[in-house]
Amino acid sequence: MIENYWTSFCGNHHTSSNCTVRFLQICFGITLSFLTLCICLFHKEPPKRIHQFFCLRLVSALFNGIIGSLDLVLGIWVLRENHSKPLILWLVILIQGFTWLFINLIICVRGTRIRKSSLRLLSIFSFFYGLVSSCLSVNNAVFGDELAVRTILDVLLLPGSVLLLLSAYKGYRFDESGESSLYEPLNAGDSNGFSEKADFDNRVSQFAKAGLFSTLSFWWLNSLIKRGNVKDLEEEDIPELRKEERAETCYSLFEENLIEQKRRLGSSCQPSILKVTVLCVWRELLTSGFFAFMKIVAVSAGPLLLNAFILVAEGNASFRYEGLVLAVLLFFSKMIESLSQRQWYFRCRIVGLRVRSLLTAAINKKQLRLNNSSRLIHSGSEIMNYATVDAYRIGEFPYWFHQLWTTSFQLLIALGILFHSVGVATFSALAVIILTVLCNAPIAKLQNKFQSELMTSQDERLKACNESLVNMKVLKLYAWESHFKKVIEKLRNIELKSLKAVQMRKAYNAVLFWSSPVFVSAATFATCYFLDIPLRASNVFTFVATLRLVQDPVRMIPDVIGVTIQAKVAFSRIATFLEAPELQGGERRRKQRSEGNQNAIIIKSASFSWEEKGSTKPNLRNVSLEVKFGEKVAVCGEVGSGKSTLLAAILGETPCVSGTIDFYGTIAYVSQTAWIQTGTIRDNILFGGVMDEHRYRETIQKSSLDKDLELLPDGDQTEIGERGVNLSGGQKQRIQLARALYQDADIYLLDDPFSAVDAHTASSLFQEYVMDALAGKAVLLVTHQVDFLPAFDSVLLMSDGEITEADTYQELLARSRDFQDLVNAHRETAGSERVVAVENPTKPVKEINRVISSQSKVLKPSRLIKQEEREKGDTGLRPYIQYMNQNKGYIFFFIASLAQVTFAVGQILQNSWMAANVDNPQVSTLKLILVYLLIGLCSVLCLMVRSVCVVIMCMKSSASLFSQLLNSLFRAPMSFYDSTPLGRILSRVSSDLSIVDLDVPFGLIFVVASSVNTGCSLGVLAIVTWQVLFVSVPMVYLAFRLQKYYFQTAKELMRINGTTRSYVANHLAESVAGAITIRAFDEEERFFKKSLTLIDTNASPFFHSFAANEWLIQRLETVSAIVLASTAFCMILLPTGTFSSGFIGMALSYGLSLNMGLVYSVQNQCYLANWIISVERLNQYTHLTPEAPEVIEETRPPVNWPVTGRVEISDLQIRYRRESPLVLKGISCTFEGGHKIGIVGRTGSGKTTLISALFRLVEPVGGKIVVDGVDISKIGVHDLRSRFGIIPQDPTLFNGTVRFNLDPLCQHSDAEIWEVLGKCQLKEVVQEKENGLDSLVVEDGSNWSMGQRQLFCLGRAVLRRSRVLVLDEATASIDNATDLILQKTIRREFADCTVITVAHRIPTVMDCTMVLSISDGRIVEYDEPMKLMKDENSLFGKLVKEYWSHYNSADSR
């Protein structure tokens, strides 16, 4: 039945070449119609034109309209008479008639609405279409039996096409003012190609205004690629994206569709994020789908032409010049295939770019809206992973999307061609293909499972990496690097197990699908043998050619499955995140401030809870509060009483479960933990506001920043590091205060802002900032510093989530027992050494300001944050060698490459055996098939060896590279973290490492495979027809030159892409960390817009990179088409019988796949060149200059060192970088063993630097520190830090349990931990938790108050019981009552230890043995506190006088 159908479709089998020609005519007609449609739809914004030569267009319209109409009538007539004519004949005539009418309508009637360049290009294509159709019709009329009427109509197409050409060029007069000429990119610019006009036309990509020819040929990229060959590209050299690809456009469309879907579904249903995303890109998906369809149709013409060519070689030509015609058709079919495939891939990449941009933008916006419960589920590191890994994986999926259906479609067409070649034996081929797919089905399910496991384990490892990198200073201080590194290594090993499973399945799939053509061929030929179907060169090599063209898409099935699974898992994770609950206004209402209204905040019977409604007892209960404008309200209470939660409730962070809360006007917020952005000090203060010089200067003065800025290299333009790592805690807090003050808000919420600054600065800030600058504002200030309380209009006393007392200071002091205990506790901590107040309290301030130099810790060159390293020029072989040298991976790569070469040689031997013996009567068919199968099986064995070796190399290299990277990062000095943004490091351990794990290993072998296959194809062509070398050698040379020309630009584009990707990650990391502050200042929109800008900055080099890739491939495909056509011409010109038809068929079958092989070769090389940059980027961080060794065996201190804790500091000099000034300038002093040492000085005077030197976080450039006779510079840093104890200024908790945070090394029993918790006033709090010591501590310890976090840090020190303990203002964030208990605990637990206290509170050091005063990096004085207080010129004495002057004045109010 199928045989009869084929006969009715094509007619006589002996005229199959005519059938092929007709089939190609149908393809060309459809292509031209689609091209016309595209011009009509997408190129219809014309410049102004004046009509001219109307008669010419009228004549053309009438003449061509008549021809087209007659073609349609003839086609319908032939259709009715199909019992006597082949089906394909009426189809050709109908399509030709429709195409001609459509083109005529556009050129002659609608031409005034089409771009000039597009109109002229269409007329040129129409002319060639008419010319070819006329020639073919005349040829068929002479040598065949074509219809006479159709011949006449086809001949008339030629004059008709000339009329269309004239109509396009002469039928209109165009106004050139607004038109971009088709050839404008060729002529624009000066001799260097870089005139101002050609300089990307207002920074927008040339793609935005490219004509049809320029779009199809990627001509618009010429200027950028040329520029990349003249100079190394920089970010500013890359044009901006056109509007359609910008993140703002993509996200706006996403939001519109989301709103529309919500409106349709109603409030009860959540719209599908996937559906909304597809709605944003469906047009481009359809367009790319059409190009995919055209590519499949064009590629399917190859085997048909090959079959016709072999028939001609056997002497069965239908007419004299049939071979030449077939060669020309072969060339044009390959060119159409190239154009279609390039546009298919290019437009899919655009879809991927848009999806990636809109998802990244959506993640950025969503994270600014997450409520507390959502943040507990989606940690900061996970959010980073969604944007930096998952969004990129989804962005890659559209590239593979059409492979899901084109593979099946191409397979169906191939089966049709195979049936024409070998008849019913095709069913054997189909059975093997189905069996192959069925074998892959369970593997696909396993792959899905393993991929999910891999992504989950990757998340866990990234979370641990992020936590360790963020808190690296704490890890070094506690000497916990090795333990946390082992935790990460353990998670990495779990990840590697999943990676191995994924890669082994990928290897299995590769073997399965690469070997399937061998088994398909063997099964088919065996069926032919048993069914006595003759095997001839024409049907065998038509079969082989068809199979060679099908096998590449079939081989891609594993990749398609893998990418689809990855995208599915990634999309589900992002969708879950985007659907997470957001902050709700609830009962919180913001109202405009009116002139008559004096109320700033009104809270009525409100309760607030961090958890879900009704799930637990509310964190704040029965809160009623009114704050008026101009009123200053202090909030105090013990640790964990709910002070910070109250501020969070007013900000809307803590959900209101009952009651109401109203506020009037704008809010400014200062968090307890300072949040600083990477950038200049001015940027941090302005925070997006407009510069007002007067207000700005006043803000600097009121925030006590003026003296600090005077000493900075560039003043307020000095760049500060990520999270303000190069600033002291006090400086960061004052920048926060300046940011809030500059906003000139109506309501100020200040969360313990003075805990991080010294006593003098705190006093100055309170007077100048709170009482003066904020006069007239509503101020709610959380504080533990009781001495400030008398100045407030009212004081709120909180306990256990309730406001227990609210009144003036004097009233509370008179009647509240709890408040009296609070004040008395403060007086007790202050000690009894009361100093008489000075007569003029302001005088000491001036004197102290004169004495204390504000030398800052940041006195360095203004650019602390280093610009990200970016290699320039050719990467060379270095990164490849670095990758393959890991664990001797080169051995496995060599074996894999050898196996791949053997496989390719085996395929050639297979086909050579078949070509040489298919027509040889002396070789039986059975022998022919058996030898063919045996060679194939040997080749498959080589494939298995190749795949296994690649997986082994992958695992060894991935494990080794990450191990080196992790060791390097954990051994890097703190100066590296101070000058390197976290996002830059995280991009290495996330996206770059993911590429190295998943893409690089198979990328290497695919480059070898595709290069070997291309070489084999060229070799076969050259052996069969050596004359083609005259064409192929220059063409291959041209291909290499084009590739080199391309690589110069492409590598820089990918490097810039990697660098700009870090910008997106950095901004997201900062936004996640500062989300509360951003929301408090209503700056969400500004941060979101900045994220859009950064996404575009990253997307632009990526867009131009993949466009450049298509630019190169299209030119290489043209080269391969020329080589193929030249080979065909050579074969035609050779005398008949020079080569057997078998070898001719073999050569052409390889030639047909040459362009595909060349494309895959270059494409794989390009991908690998881009991927190998990730190895290069990892390598930048695997060879960081390490800090001192952890352990030096020759100089290890005794086990019980230090015994007494005597610290001798001799002429200590510290600078942070070689070119920076000294921060400590010759410090010399001795801390006797068992003494309690207090270190005081103004913020930035060098106190923290001295502590850093003691722990060797920074190495001295001169002098030394000796502890109990041991020079600490001579021993390992682990031995040093593990013997000291510290309670850092910024309390840090890690994700895990209470037990883990107190004892991560598991060195103590539960009983010891409970005992310590009791001493630190945490026992009751932990016991109230359901899980006790196993109670959850989330990332950053955000589910515990700041004071509780600091108590945990104290607990660590008590557990360690070191002979030398350092307290860096350890009690700054706790209330005075708790402070009193803790001071007693420290005195009791560390009675015989050396305790070094960096103090901001003067009372903290009053009971110290000695006090060290530092100013400007030098020792001002060092003596007993009582002696210093008696000295009139003593700096410490003046600080104490200032403190008590302020305290006494407050106490008397």
From Swiss-Prot:
Protein purpose: Pump for glutathione S-conjugates.
Gene this chain is encoded by: ABCC10
Keywords: ATP-binding, Membrane, Nucleotide-binding, Repeat, Translocase, Transmembrane, Transmembrane helix, Transport
Membrane topology field: Multi-pass membrane protein
InterPro entries membership: AAA+_ATPase, ABC1_TM_dom, ABC1_TM_sf, ABC_transporter-like_ATP-bd, ABC_transporter-like_CS, ABC_transporter_C-like, ABCC10-like_N, ABCC_6TM_D1
Signal peptide stretch: none
Disulfides per UniProt: none
Residue positions binding ATP 1: G637, E638, V639, G640, S641, G642, K643, S644
Keyword Transport: yes
Xref: SMART domains: AAA
Descriptive protein name: ABC transporter C family member 10
Residue intervals of the ABC transmembrane type-1 domain: 285-566, 886-1170
Molecular-function annotations in GO: ABC-type xenobiotic transporter activity; ATP binding; ATP hydrolysis activity; ATPase-coupled transmembrane transporter activity
Subcellular location: Membrane
